[in-house]
Amino acid sequence: IEKQAREFKPQFVSVSDENDAKKLRTSLADTDIEVGYGMDGLIRCATIEPCDIVVTAIVGMLGIRPTIAAIKAKKTIALANKETLVTAGHIIIPLAKEYGVSILPVDSEHSAIFQSLQGNSMNPIKKILLTASGGPFRGRKLSELEGIRVEDALKHPNWSMGQKITIDSSTMVNKGLEVIEAKWLFDVDLSQIHVVVHPQSVIHSAVEYADGAVIAQLGTPDRRIPIQYALYYPSRPALSGDRLDLFKLKDLTFEAPDLDTFKGLALAMKAARAGGNIPTAFNAANERAVALFLNKKIKYLEIIDIIEACMENASFIENPSVDEILDTERCAYDYISK
Protein backbone atom coordinates (compact mmCIF):
# COMPACT_ATOMS: atom_id res chain seq x y z
CA ILE A 1 0.00 0.00 0.00
CA GLU A 2 2.98 2.32 0.53
CA LYS A 3 3.96 1.77 -3.10
CA GLN A 4 0.44 2.61 -4.28
CA ALA A 5 0.29 5.68 -2.05
CA ARG A 6 3.57 6.99 -3.45
CA GLU A 7 2.46 6.34 -7.02
CA PHE A 8 -1.00 7.92 -6.82
CA LYS A 9 -0.39 10.48 -4.05
CA PRO A 10 -3.85 10.44 -2.41
CA GLN A 11 -4.76 12.92 0.30
CA PHE A 12 -5.73 10.12 2.70
CA VAL A 13 -5.04 6.39 3.08
CA SER A 14 -6.72 4.02 5.52
CA VAL A 15 -5.84 0.51 6.70
CA SER A 16 -7.70 -1.86 9.01
CA ASP A 17 -5.22 -2.16 11.89
CA GLU A 18 -3.84 0.59 14.16
CA ASN A 19 -0.35 -0.92 14.23
CA ASP A 20 -0.29 -1.09 10.44
CA ALA A 21 -1.38 2.55 10.35
CA LYS A 22 1.53 3.54 12.60
CA LYS A 23 4.00 1.70 10.36
CA LEU A 24 2.52 3.28 7.24
CA ARG A 25 2.66 6.77 8.77
CA THR A 26 6.35 6.24 9.46
CA SER A 27 6.95 4.97 5.92
CA LEU A 28 5.11 7.96 4.42
CA ALA A 29 6.54 10.56 6.80
CA ASP A 30 8.30 12.34 3.93
CA THR A 31 4.93 12.91 2.18
CA ASP A 32 1.79 14.93 2.94
CA ILE A 33 -0.40 11.80 2.90
CA GLU A 34 -2.59 11.31 5.97
CA VAL A 35 -3.06 7.77 7.31
CA GLY A 36 -6.09 6.46 9.21
CA TYR A 37 -7.39 3.07 10.26
CA GLY A 38 -10.50 1.10 11.20
CA MET A 39 -14.08 2.19 10.63
CA ASP A 40 -13.24 5.85 11.27
CA GLY A 41 -10.65 5.65 8.52
CA LEU A 42 -13.11 4.07 6.09
CA ILE A 43 -15.71 6.74 6.80
CA ARG A 44 -13.11 9.47 6.33
CA CYS A 45 -12.16 7.94 2.96
CA ALA A 46 -15.83 7.82 1.95
CA THR A 47 -16.57 11.42 2.88
CA ILE A 48 -13.34 13.31 2.17
CA GLU A 49 -14.05 16.70 0.63
CA PRO A 50 -12.35 16.67 -2.82
CA CYS A 51 -14.00 13.35 -3.69
CA ASP A 52 -17.14 13.33 -5.87
CA ILE A 53 -17.54 9.58 -6.49
CA VAL A 54 -16.94 6.77 -3.99
CA VAL A 55 -16.20 3.24 -5.16
CA THR A 56 -17.41 0.88 -2.44
CA ALA A 57 -15.48 -2.32 -3.05
CA ILE A 58 -14.88 -3.59 0.49
CA VAL A 59 -15.74 -7.26 0.87
CA GLY A 60 -18.49 -7.99 3.38
CA MET A 61 -20.74 -5.92 5.61
CA LEU A 62 -17.91 -3.58 6.56
CA GLY A 63 -19.09 -1.53 3.59
CA ILE A 64 -22.46 -0.57 5.08
CA ARG A 65 -21.47 2.30 7.38
CA PRO A 66 -18.99 3.96 4.96
CA THR A 67 -21.61 3.76 2.19
CA ILE A 68 -24.21 5.40 4.42
CA ALA A 69 -21.70 8.11 5.33
CA ALA A 70 -20.85 8.69 1.66
CA ILE A 71 -24.53 9.03 0.76
CA LYS A 72 -25.08 11.56 3.54
CA ALA A 73 -22.07 13.47 2.18
CA LYS A 74 -23.84 13.42 -1.22
CA LYS A 75 -21.17 11.43 -3.01
CA THR A 76 -22.08 9.43 -6.10
CA ILE A 77 -21.75 5.73 -5.23
CA ALA A 78 -20.07 3.25 -7.59
CA LEU A 79 -21.20 0.03 -5.94
CA ALA A 80 -19.06 -3.10 -6.09
CA ASN A 81 -20.00 -4.33 -2.61
CA LYS A 82 -22.98 -6.68 -2.98
CA GLU A 83 -23.39 -7.20 0.75
CA THR A 84 -24.35 -3.56 1.33
CA LEU A 85 -27.59 -3.93 -0.64
CA VAL A 86 -28.15 -7.61 0.17
CA THR A 87 -28.24 -6.89 3.90
CA ALA A 88 -29.15 -3.20 4.08
CA GLY A 89 -30.95 -2.39 0.83
CA HIS A 90 -34.00 -1.26 2.81
CA ILE A 91 -31.78 1.40 4.41
CA ILE A 92 -29.45 2.34 1.55
CA ILE A 93 -31.94 2.84 -1.30
CA PRO A 94 -34.39 5.15 0.56
CA LEU A 95 -31.42 7.10 1.95
CA ALA A 96 -29.94 7.58 -1.53
CA LYS A 97 -33.31 8.85 -2.77
CA GLU A 98 -33.58 11.21 0.20
CA TYR A 99 -30.15 12.73 -0.51
CA GLY A 100 -30.49 12.67 -4.30
CA VAL A 101 -27.50 10.34 -4.67
CA SER A 102 -26.96 8.08 -7.69
CA ILE A 103 -25.91 4.47 -7.13
CA LEU A 104 -24.05 3.16 -10.17
CA PRO A 105 -23.45 -0.61 -10.36
CA VAL A 106 -19.92 -1.92 -10.91
CA ASP A 107 -20.71 -5.65 -11.15
CA SER A 108 -20.78 -6.70 -14.80
CA GLU A 109 -24.32 -8.11 -14.68
CA HIS A 110 -25.86 -5.13 -12.90
CA SER A 111 -23.94 -2.75 -15.12
CA ALA A 112 -25.37 -4.60 -18.13
CA ILE A 113 -28.89 -4.18 -16.76
CA PHE A 114 -28.23 -0.51 -16.00
CA GLN A 115 -26.91 0.04 -19.53
CA SER A 116 -29.92 -1.76 -21.00
CA LEU A 117 -32.20 0.66 -19.14
CA GLN A 118 -30.64 3.80 -20.61
CA GLY A 119 -33.20 5.80 -22.57
CA ASN A 120 -36.01 3.53 -21.40
CA SER A 121 -36.75 4.86 -17.93
CA MET A 122 -40.38 5.61 -18.79
CA ASN A 123 -41.06 2.11 -20.10
CA PRO A 124 -42.16 -0.63 -17.68
CA ILE A 125 -39.80 -3.56 -17.13
CA LYS A 126 -41.41 -6.95 -17.68
CA LYS A 127 -38.42 -8.96 -16.52
CA ILE A 128 -34.71 -8.80 -15.87
CA LEU A 129 -32.65 -11.60 -17.40
CA LEU A 130 -29.68 -12.01 -15.06
CA THR A 131 -27.06 -14.17 -16.73
CA ALA A 132 -24.75 -16.64 -15.00
CA SER A 133 -21.83 -18.60 -16.41
CA GLY A 134 -22.84 -21.64 -14.38
CA GLY A 135 -19.37 -21.84 -12.84
CA PRO A 136 -16.90 -24.72 -13.09
CA PHE A 137 -19.44 -27.39 -12.12
CA ARG A 138 -22.24 -26.56 -14.57
CA GLY A 139 -23.97 -29.70 -15.76
CA ARG A 140 -22.96 -31.82 -12.78
CA LYS A 141 -25.43 -33.40 -10.39
CA LEU A 142 -25.31 -33.04 -6.63
CA SER A 143 -23.76 -36.48 -6.15
CA GLU A 144 -20.90 -35.46 -8.44
CA LEU A 145 -19.95 -32.58 -6.14
CA GLU A 146 -18.89 -34.88 -3.32
CA GLY A 147 -15.17 -34.57 -2.77
CA ILE A 148 -14.72 -31.27 -4.63
CA ARG A 149 -11.38 -29.76 -3.63
CA VAL A 150 -10.54 -26.09 -3.10
CA GLU A 151 -8.39 -26.02 -6.23
CA ASP A 152 -11.27 -27.47 -8.28
CA ALA A 153 -13.71 -24.79 -7.11
CA LEU A 154 -11.22 -21.99 -7.85
CA LYS A 155 -11.09 -22.79 -11.58
CA HIS A 156 -13.67 -20.42 -13.05
CA PRO A 157 -14.18 -21.02 -16.78
CA ASN A 158 -14.48 -17.36 -17.85
CA TRP A 159 -13.65 -14.78 -15.19
CA SER A 160 -10.52 -14.01 -13.19
CA MET A 161 -11.68 -13.07 -9.67
CA GLY A 162 -10.74 -13.29 -6.01
CA GLN A 163 -10.99 -16.58 -4.13
CA LYS A 164 -14.17 -15.86 -2.18
CA ILE A 165 -16.24 -14.69 -5.16
CA THR A 166 -14.91 -17.58 -7.27
CA ILE A 167 -16.15 -20.09 -4.69
CA ASP A 168 -19.46 -18.19 -4.55
CA SER A 169 -19.71 -18.50 -8.32
CA SER A 170 -19.13 -22.25 -8.14
CA THR A 171 -22.00 -22.70 -5.64
CA MET A 172 -24.15 -20.08 -7.44
CA VAL A 173 -24.47 -18.25 -4.11
CA ASN A 174 -22.96 -15.27 -5.93
CA LYS A 175 -25.84 -15.26 -8.38
CA GLY A 176 -28.27 -15.41 -5.48
CA LEU A 177 -26.63 -12.35 -3.95
CA GLU A 178 -26.90 -10.63 -7.33
CA VAL A 179 -30.63 -11.38 -7.50
CA ILE A 180 -31.16 -9.62 -4.17
CA GLU A 181 -28.93 -6.74 -5.25
CA ALA A 182 -30.87 -6.35 -8.51
CA LYS A 183 -34.17 -6.23 -6.62
CA TRP A 184 -32.98 -3.18 -4.70
CA LEU A 185 -31.02 -1.47 -7.47
CA PHE A 186 -33.77 -1.59 -10.06
CA ASP A 187 -36.85 -1.52 -7.80
CA VAL A 188 -38.41 -4.71 -9.18
CA ASP A 189 -40.20 -7.64 -7.62
CA LEU A 190 -38.30 -10.89 -7.20
CA SER A 191 -40.73 -12.55 -9.60
CA GLN A 192 -39.41 -10.26 -12.36
CA ILE A 193 -35.80 -11.43 -11.99
CA HIS A 194 -34.94 -14.54 -14.00
CA VAL A 195 -31.53 -16.21 -13.74
CA VAL A 196 -30.34 -17.54 -17.10
CA VAL A 197 -27.27 -19.77 -17.32
CA HIS A 198 -25.21 -18.57 -20.28
CA PRO A 199 -21.85 -20.41 -20.30
CA GLN A 200 -20.15 -18.19 -22.89
CA SER A 201 -20.47 -15.01 -20.76
CA VAL A 202 -21.00 -12.85 -23.85
CA ILE A 203 -24.42 -11.48 -22.92
CA HIS A 204 -23.85 -9.96 -19.51
CA SER A 205 -27.57 -9.51 -18.76
CA ALA A 206 -30.69 -8.16 -20.44
CA VAL A 207 -33.99 -6.39 -19.84
CA GLU A 208 -37.32 -7.39 -21.37
CA TYR A 209 -39.86 -4.60 -21.72
CA ALA A 210 -43.63 -4.71 -21.75
CA ASP A 211 -43.74 -4.48 -25.55
CA GLY A 212 -41.68 -7.66 -25.93
CA ALA A 213 -38.40 -5.94 -26.80
CA VAL A 214 -35.30 -7.40 -25.13
CA ILE A 215 -32.28 -5.13 -24.78
CA ALA A 216 -28.98 -6.69 -23.74
CA GLN A 217 -25.38 -5.63 -23.21
CA LEU A 218 -22.75 -7.81 -24.87
CA GLY A 219 -18.98 -7.81 -24.60
CA THR A 220 -15.87 -9.75 -23.72
CA PRO A 221 -15.55 -10.89 -20.07
CA ASP A 222 -13.48 -7.84 -19.08
CA ARG A 223 -14.17 -6.37 -15.63
CA ARG A 224 -12.62 -3.05 -16.64
CA ILE A 225 -15.58 -2.20 -18.87
CA PRO A 226 -18.28 -1.97 -16.15
CA ILE A 227 -15.80 -0.35 -13.75
CA GLN A 228 -14.97 2.37 -16.28
CA TYR A 229 -18.65 2.85 -17.15
CA ALA A 230 -19.48 3.54 -13.50
CA LEU A 231 -16.54 5.92 -13.07
CA TYR A 232 -17.17 7.91 -16.25
CA TYR A 233 -20.96 7.60 -16.59
CA PRO A 234 -22.56 8.68 -18.85
CA SER A 235 -19.42 8.98 -21.01
CA ARG A 236 -17.70 6.04 -22.71
CA PRO A 237 -13.97 6.78 -23.08
CA ALA A 238 -11.87 4.51 -25.29
CA LEU A 239 -10.57 1.39 -23.57
CA SER A 240 -7.82 -0.86 -24.91
CA GLY A 241 -8.24 -4.61 -24.88
CA ASP A 242 -9.91 -7.49 -26.70
CA ARG A 243 -13.03 -6.66 -28.69
CA LEU A 244 -16.09 -8.83 -29.19
CA ASP A 245 -15.97 -10.35 -32.68
CA LEU A 246 -19.42 -11.67 -33.55
CA PHE A 247 -18.02 -13.67 -36.48
CA LYS A 248 -15.86 -15.70 -34.10
CA LEU A 249 -18.76 -16.67 -31.85
CA LYS A 250 -19.64 -20.31 -32.45
CA ASP A 251 -22.58 -20.64 -30.08
CA LEU A 252 -24.60 -18.64 -27.62
CA THR A 253 -26.48 -21.06 -25.37
CA PHE A 254 -28.92 -20.57 -22.53
CA GLU A 255 -30.36 -22.87 -19.90
CA ALA A 256 -32.29 -22.75 -16.65
CA PRO A 257 -30.29 -23.07 -13.43
CA ASP A 258 -30.36 -26.45 -11.69
CA LEU A 259 -31.73 -25.48 -8.28
CA ASP A 260 -31.58 -29.05 -6.98
CA THR A 261 -27.82 -29.19 -7.47
CA PHE A 262 -27.01 -25.55 -6.82
CA LYS A 263 -29.03 -25.01 -3.69
CA GLY A 264 -27.15 -21.80 -2.90
CA LEU A 265 -29.24 -19.95 -5.48
CA ALA A 266 -32.46 -21.49 -4.18
CA LEU A 267 -31.57 -20.52 -0.60
CA ALA A 268 -30.79 -16.96 -1.67
CA MET A 269 -34.22 -16.69 -3.27
CA LYS A 270 -35.76 -18.08 -0.09
CA ALA A 271 -33.85 -15.50 1.99
CA ALA A 272 -34.95 -12.71 -0.34
CA ARG A 273 -38.60 -13.73 -0.07
CA ALA A 274 -38.33 -13.88 3.73
CA GLY A 275 -36.75 -10.42 3.83
CA GLY A 276 -35.83 -8.64 7.04
CA ASN A 277 -32.54 -9.88 8.45
CA ILE A 278 -32.67 -13.31 6.79
CA PRO A 279 -30.54 -12.21 3.80
CA THR A 280 -27.96 -11.10 6.39
CA ALA A 281 -28.00 -14.55 8.00
CA PHE A 282 -27.63 -16.08 4.52
CA ASN A 283 -24.72 -13.81 3.62
CA ALA A 284 -22.90 -14.11 6.96
CA ALA A 285 -23.19 -17.89 6.97
CA ASN A 286 -21.83 -18.08 3.44
CA GLU A 287 -18.88 -15.80 4.25
CA ARG A 288 -17.85 -17.92 7.19
CA ALA A 289 -18.50 -21.25 5.44
CA VAL A 290 -16.46 -20.24 2.39
CA ALA A 291 -13.58 -19.19 4.66
CA LEU A 292 -13.73 -22.58 6.38
CA PHE A 293 -13.74 -24.37 3.02
CA LEU A 294 -10.81 -22.34 1.70
CA ASN A 295 -8.91 -23.28 4.86
CA LYS A 296 -9.88 -26.93 4.26
CA LYS A 297 -11.85 -27.14 7.52
CA ILE A 298 -15.11 -28.30 5.90
CA LYS A 299 -16.20 -30.15 2.76
CA TYR A 300 -17.53 -28.34 -0.30
CA LEU A 301 -21.16 -29.40 0.12
CA GLU A 302 -21.10 -28.38 3.77
CA ILE A 303 -21.05 -24.73 2.66
CA ILE A 304 -24.73 -25.00 1.74
CA ASP A 305 -25.59 -27.06 4.83
CA ILE A 306 -24.16 -24.31 7.04
CA ILE A 307 -26.05 -21.57 5.20
CA GLU A 308 -29.36 -23.42 5.52
CA ALA A 309 -28.82 -24.13 9.22
CA CYS A 310 -27.97 -20.48 9.96
CA MET A 311 -31.04 -19.23 8.11
CA GLU A 312 -33.24 -21.56 10.15
CA ASN A 313 -31.54 -20.50 13.38
CA ALA A 314 -31.87 -16.74 12.81
CA SER A 315 -34.41 -14.81 14.90
CA PHE A 316 -36.46 -12.83 12.37
CA ILE A 317 -36.35 -9.02 12.44
CA GLU A 318 -38.62 -7.41 9.85
CA ASN A 319 -36.91 -4.03 9.44
CA PRO A 320 -33.43 -4.33 10.97
CA SER A 321 -31.25 -1.35 11.84
CA VAL A 322 -27.55 -1.36 10.97
CA ASP A 323 -26.77 -2.50 14.51
CA GLU A 324 -29.31 -5.33 14.21
CA ILE A 325 -27.83 -6.34 10.84
CA LEU A 326 -24.37 -6.55 12.36
CA ASP A 327 -25.77 -8.40 15.38
CA THR A 328 -27.38 -10.94 13.04
CA GLU A 329 -23.98 -11.39 11.43
CA ARG A 330 -22.35 -11.98 14.83
CA CYS A 331 -25.06 -14.46 15.81
CA ALA A 332 -24.47 -16.42 12.59
CA TYR A 333 -20.73 -16.50 13.24
CA ASP A 334 -21.29 -17.64 16.83
CA TYR A 335 -23.70 -20.35 15.68
CA ILE A 336 -21.17 -21.69 13.18
CA SER A 337 -18.31 -21.63 15.69
CA LYS A 338 -20.34 -23.86 18.01
Where are these predicted regions, by residue range?
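Catalytic, metal-anchored helix/loop core of enzyme active sites in primary metabolism
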Residues: 1-338
